[in-house]
């Protein structure tokens, strides 16, 4: 092979890589299980669900700087910086917990449905939406007043959601393999659209400029949907075990954290209807949830070493039990 041709291949291979690599591992004390996490880009703080508490991590220093405790089973955290408030979905207590973003002190609770899971903030209506996994509904909270704004009845089990900033919230319905479009002011379902061939969607993100919704699905693919028509315009292969999907408007990357394979699938939005897999970055098995700092473009993934135990005594057909190996929980930070 000629040197010039070889050089072109090397250059092409370099450009085909996202640049994402592990920057550090941040240890977090405690052996509770985890779910969603989120980042405040203005402060570089990472809010991590961890059993009965939220661990607050300084993303720059890589250390825990605070905790929000006294809850039962935390799923997610949403931030409304304009009101200096954060909101926690406590699935064990069936409520949304409100806290002060600066002091981290809890300041209130709002009753929700059964097992509030995903929680997001909709800037258009100044409302927080908590999606109740076991009562097929969404609880809307007035972020400024800290009071219940209403409830949306859904048809199926909600997973993650995204807001378009124009008065619409979209949510994955896992057991129906659908996306529901909600009027976030009127609190009513406007449309429900099939995701086929995508099955059992979990993670969701959105490019609000191109009006494209990204749904990470259980059958190792990501669906791209037109947010106005509900048409699936593309599907992209991803790793196995996805649970979180993020979109970075600065790089046009769509990111899927796939815990079963232990990879971060990096996809580039070439155009609104065309997408290409850039690479699958090795993370760690079990790293299924993540959060993106849109300012630095760094990604934080929650993970721990988990031991699989046999079903409880007397329940031979029960589910295998899981136990976190002590001292192994923390965050993996990946950057470019």
Feature map (PLM): residue ranges:
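Positively charged n-region of N-terminal signal peptides that target proteins for export
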Residues: 1-4
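Predominantly soluble domains enriched in secretory-pathway, periplasmic, or organellar proteins
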Residues: 15-336
């Amino acid at each position: 092979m000629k040197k010039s041709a070889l050089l072109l291949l090397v250059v092409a291979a370099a450009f085909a890589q996202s640049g994402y690599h592990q920057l550090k591992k941040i240890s977090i004390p405690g052996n509770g299980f985890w779910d969603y996490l989120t980042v405040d880009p203005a402060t570089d703080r990472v809010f991590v669900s961890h059993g009965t508490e939220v661990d607050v991590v300084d993303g720059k220093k890589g250390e825990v700087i605070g905790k929000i405790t006294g809850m039962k089973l935390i799923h997610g955290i949403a931030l409304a910086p304009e009101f200096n408030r954060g909101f926690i979905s406590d699935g064990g207590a069936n409520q949304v917990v409100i806290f002060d973003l600066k002091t981290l002190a809890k300041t209130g609770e709002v009753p929700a449905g059964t097992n509030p899971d995903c929680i997001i903030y909709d800037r258009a209506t100044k409302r927080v939406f908590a999606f109740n996994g076991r009562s097929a509904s969404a609880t809307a909270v007035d972020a400024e007043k800290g009071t219940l704004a209403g409830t949306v009845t859904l048809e199926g089990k909600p997973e993650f959601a995204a807001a378009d900033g124009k008065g619409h919230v979209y949510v994955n319905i896992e057991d129906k393999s659908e996306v529901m479009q909600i009027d976030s002011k009127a609190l009513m379902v406007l449309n429900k659209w099939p995701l086929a061939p995508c099955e059992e969607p979990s993670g969701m993100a959105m490019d609000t400029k191109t009006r494209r919704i990204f749904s990470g699905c259980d059958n190792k693919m990501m669906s791209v949907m037109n947010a106005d028509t509900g048409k699936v315009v593309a599907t992209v292969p991803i790793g196995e075990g996805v649970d979180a999907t993020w979109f970075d408007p600065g790089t046009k990357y769509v990111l899927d954290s796939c815990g079963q394979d232990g990879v971060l699938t990096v996809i580039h939005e070439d155009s609104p209807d065309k997408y290409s897999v850039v690479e699958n970055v090795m993370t760690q098995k079990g790293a299924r949830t993540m959060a993106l700092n849109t300012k630095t473009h760094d990604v934080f993934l929650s993970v721990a070493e988990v031991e699989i135990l046999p079903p409880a005594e007397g329940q031979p057909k029960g589910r295998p039990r899981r136990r976190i190996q002590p001292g192994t929980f923390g965050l993996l930070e990946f950057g470019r």
